[in-house]
């Protein structure tokens, strides 16, 4: 419906625009319609020694970003928390098994508490709803943190692609090999992972990894066979089988190129026509992409494939047999109701006949997500990126016997052009041109001063090692633990000091303490409910402030990065902190300095920590708005309710953490935007001009570049803000008006005269 409306709008826009056109505009449109296909073109390349403005901003060193809007992520997070056991595999994947068991216990306790409260609504409702709100909040935040592994569903495009694949794929179902071997390899059955899986693959894929074995017609499992390759991927729990049959050998030809392409075509030809379900369509997609990628490994995609020896037609079957034994499928299965997909499939082919090709290892990987059942578009773009990327331009000889398996994560759609630009920046970053990418830096070994040519990565590595060796404080961890214990015991302490005086506390009995702890007569259901509420508040509040401590530690590390970076051009401080030192006396040094600045600003957790900080910022504003509304309702009775006291404790603790983060962020911004460093280097250049008049022209050039760098940093740098990820301008302005209006009402009610803070520019 929306697409039809857009088409109608475009049609009417062109219709009314035609009445405004003159002859010159019509001629230009005709020229644009012809396009640039007939224009002469010649090869070009990007110069990696030049820099872009993205390098100064830091966007060159891009971080992973979610493809799904934050509104959808919020909805997914709420659903995954409410139906927590149904998404067990997803939670295990993004956390761990032990943490999942702990969270599942908290979830069951929360459900039990809600049921007991509905049966006996005696205790305060805030004691039950508080942990529930914390659980929903942190589940949503965690879903946004791991959202880079969730891909956008392709929707109708994916359905159309599957229908197109069903029309284009054909399979015979009965294909014989050249030797007519009676023991044909019939199926590939996915089994549970064995502990013998290598540590590298265990680290790369995380959780359960499927092991693949070849099953013959007789029911025995084999690893190698000389027969034709008939793999069927069987999924557990009644999932449909996916059959891939080898194509029948066609007419033999003497041309080596045709034989090689025929051998590639035989490996991936045909998928059974009876695959009609949704998962079968997905399997068809993977098989066709694999086949197209294998065929594209020739000269069509830019990868050189050299035929050193003429391949005779009588050797074709033996080549196919050798290649068939080099298949390796690694399938990762998720038991979630919303997640059932392939995680990765990898293919590598090599031969002893002398064929060599660039990028023989072809990879396919899919991350777990509830929406990737319809997402064949992602794999398509991944393969195009893989086959047409710059890494396909090398030519190597593959003579290995075993299979080489390489896995490429494909969680997000990436533009190949963007990858080319990023890799060109990484070329000089990774020492591709030592003459222009290294700087002569001074390092201290004891009391000795030595020079060394260092790159950006080497200098940043030393800085990061110094930051990692820094002993972090535990003050805010202790603050979080104290607030956690106080909030967990707050209902009991509130009833205790409200109903008992200090003299009565000396002679209080255990039964009275239990009654105050439960808030009602200590019957069994009430005692169970009170104990559950205590542990829920204790655990969930501790998790919340633990995340806040992680954010504080990250901001502290960012500040240390900026602090050490600002000391690079200072000889005394560089020696004190044992980091490299160099002056901005050359244009190349200025380039390295700017690159190092952008690189360090992008190191460490970025978006994930910003999610936590933004969520805490919004929570603080929400609590402030609720408190203002309660004060406006009746400021004399505001402190009579326990939940208002609890709101004040939360607001105080959150403000302390936010003030800490704001101060660290502001200091970090000042260190990176310290123009005094560039001004000092300009003074040093003038001092050199006085001592070396023969180099005045060269030093003047460097001085001009420093002036331009100063202006550029002032132009690009923005003031630090805590809100960033979820606080777009619309939400920010609405929140500012609402909160400041509420605060204005409170102040006006307390002071007796009207004041409007929202009209004051912030």
From Swiss-Prot:
It is found in: Endoplasmic reticulum membrane; Golgi apparatus, cis-Golgi network membrane. It is a multi-pass membrane protein. Interacts with FEM1B. Keywords: Endoplasmic reticulum, Glycoprotein, Golgi apparatus, Membrane, Phosphoprotein, Transmembrane, Transmembrane helix. It comes from the Eukaryota. Residues 348-364 have a biased composition (Low complexity). One of its GO terms (biological process) is spermatogenesis. Its main location: endoplasmic reticulum. Highly expressed in testis. Disulfide bonds: none annotated. Residues 152-184, 345-415 are annotated as: Disordered. This is Protein PHTF1. The modification Phosphoserine is found at residues 272, 276-277, 334, 336. Glycans are attached at residues 179, 224, 363, 431, 674, 733.
